[in-house]
Amino acid sequence: MFLKKRHLEILKKMKETEMQNEIEKALPEEFKTRALELFILGFAELKGDKIIFTEAGKKLMEIVDKIDLEKIPDIFVDSEIIKIMELLEETGNVPEDWMLMLKERFLADENGLTEIGKEILKIYRETHPVVYLTPELLAFIKDMPKIGVYDELITYKNTKEYGDNIINALQAMRLLLISPKTESGKAFSTTKALNYVLKVASLVPNLSRALILRKEDFEILERGETTEEMTESGFYAEGKVTELGQAMMDTYKEMGKVEEKTLPIYVLEDEIKVLKAIEEIKEKYETNPEIIPTYDEIKKRTNIDDLGAVLHTLESKELIKREVVKNKDTYWMTEFGEKVKDLGEVSTDGMKAITYPESGDVPIAEWVIKGKEEGTVKRGITEKGKYLIKLSKTIKRKPYLTKYDISTLIKIPRKRYIHRDELVKLIQGHVGGDEKEIIKSLGEAESKGFIKELQNKMIKLTELGEEVKTAIEMAKIQELLATKFAVTPTTFNILKTIYDHKEEFDKVWKEKSEGKEHKENEIVLLAKYLSLTPEEIKKNLVILKNVGFIGKKGLTDAGVKLVEAYLNFYQ
């Protein structure tokens, strides 16, 4: 959305007269541009010499009457203001300088959004812009950066004729989003709808007039019908919608669409080292089968202190898999790991620079800067970024909980947001740790699917986070915190195998409790289903019993809850 004070003044004047020339006489400055923007926004119809309210325009007018236009800034609402309003409504908390921007527009007060603010947000959600593509706009977007810091957009805009008006129009059509200002400035991103506009641009390289598609036009084309105007525009020919018509319809459908965000994924420097070491060992194994990627062999090549944590992290993201070779536990790269080892590291923030635009939201400047450093962003999403999004959508994450993850899940209240700064202090008071280390762990917890952190640093548990929190609270919390590798892909695989083959394991435990000998104890049975050595199985069974996920007769309620949390997550 994009509304200037001048738009509101025109709307007020429209109550007195529908004649464009009379309104322009009273409000000559940029009248034609602002009237056209009201049409694009869906608030007015331009019919001959008249400018007429739409239903949405009438609703907006009711709000305008409540605002002292002399006191508001020149830009009343744009994509930045809408984002701040959404965050305030969602979390109840935005930074002071963001709040000031809303207050000076009468959109919020100390109690949150005002009635005016709520109505503006409601109108924004209920209206749909018109597709209005001019030759100038199509020329502008061809080489336009798609994700970046705000200065890049301004620099680009200043090289183009009508740059300011085109930026306004792109926001009005929800093709461009601008983030609220943070310590690193503002960021911007284009939405998926712009991809269809680029297709339109490729289909009509020599456009000489505006291409327009309103709601009623869209509905006519959707029925397989046309009008004289749409046929002349090239949207319909030979009894069907043309490729151009379809691209216009796709643009209309995609405008303003917000989708569920792809979980970010992180890859650390030590993980890359381990993947490359496994590759090196695999090459030697092909000529010397005695050399296999065991823990000790990988340790020898990487010299990583906390190698166990790195291996669990890689397995949790399906970048490696465990196999028993020559009666030893070994680690091998998956197809995903083969690819990731050559892409280099990436942080959660570097991924959010691209997962937010992909879903129809805007990243903040810090995320974009990180994305540029890590190669997920250039002038848009890079090939590395595209692959990591695809990877994140494809893999089935398994749990690996550090002490920070456990503390995070315990300290975040259910169904409520908490500010990151407050959460960091709570975690420090609970399990200790350096602030920087905890903030990094929160990014990793987000990639694991436990939490979401929004642009205003407000954090909330996800559905998976809520369920894993319940499982932890049902288990033995102190033992979980004291045991380094309590919840790992290995322990989870054991729990899930027992869950999936409940009848077989129940029989083993029943006969055990009755003092009967059984040729297949739980270790032998687990070895049938999992590629783990008996020693590894035994060690992890002891851990699971100690922390309260396995009892004397099978999985505890906590163990069942943890498995079912992930089964729900996979659906």
UniProtKB/Swiss-Prot annotation:
Q: Name one Pfam family in it.
A: DUF505
Domain of life, per the record?
Archaea
Q: Which InterPro entries match?
A: DUF505
Listed name of the protein: Uncharacterized protein MJ1355
